[in-house]
From Swiss-Prot:
Signal peptide, first to last residue: none
Residues modified as Phosphoserine: S7
Gene Ontology BP term (one): DNA replication
Provenance organism: Bos taurus
Entry-linked InterPro entries: NA-bd_OB-fold (IPR012340), RMI2 (IPR032245)
Keywords: Acetylation, DNA replication, DNA-binding, Nucleus, Phosphoprotein
Function: Essential component of the RMI complex, a complex that plays an important role in the processing of homologous recombination intermediates. It is required to regulate sister chromatid segregation and to limit DNA crossover. Essential for the stability, localization, and function of BLM, TOP3A, and complexes containing BLM. In the RMI complex, it is required to target BLM to chromatin and stress-induced nuclear foci and mitotic phosphorylation of BLM.
Protein name in UniProt: RecQ-mediated genome instability protein 2
Length: 157
């Protein structure tokens, strides 16, 4: 039996390495303001709370589709806008690339400035339940305050 690997690969012209660790839930503003590094090595600075940076191998973001086309979408969460690329290659279930739909996107960060940009791994329509949207900002805040404050989260240990 083969040894487990750190990631899976999605084949294609712009292959994405999928991490084995769960995605970190973030808001667009957190990435704009606190992300350090570059593609493949992004970290979320937590110096303001006296913690080591949080490794961002993959992120989970939610937002409303503002515009979409050609495998690219622009979304908006409570803190600002972000872009998602590679949507033509990801499973999405029901059609959700329609302006006004509320979706979740799991992906790998490509850029954080001037606005976050993800290479999509998964997208799901969450529009049927308005609680997803109304609670998202509080959920992210709570996770960062209580769960992601643990020293081993995001380190791959």
């Amino acid at each position: 039996m083969a040894a487990p690997t750190d990631s899976l690969s999605v084949s294609g012209p712009t292959a994405v390495r999928l991490p084995r660790s769960p995605p970190i839930k973030v808001l667009a503003e957190q990435l704009r303001r606190d992300a350090e590094g570059g593609p493949g090595s992004w970290r979320l600075s937590r110096a303001a709370v006296g913690r080591e940076p949080l490794e961002l191998r993959a992120v989970w973001m939610q937002g409303t589709v503002v515009e979409a086309g050609g495998g690219v979408a622009r979304l908006r969460d409570p803190s600002g806008s972000f872009s998602v690329r590679g949507l033509e290659r990801v499973p999405r279930g029901r059609p959700c690339l329609v302006p006004g739909k509320y979706v979740m996107v799991m992906g790998v960060i490509q850029a954080c400035s001037p606005e976050p940009c993800l290479q999509a791994v998964k997208m799901t329509d969450l529009s049927d339940n308005p609680l997803h949207e109304s609670l998202w900002e509080l959920e992210v805040e709570d996770l960062h305050r209580h769960i992601y404050s643990l020293d081993d989260v995001g380190t791959g240990d």
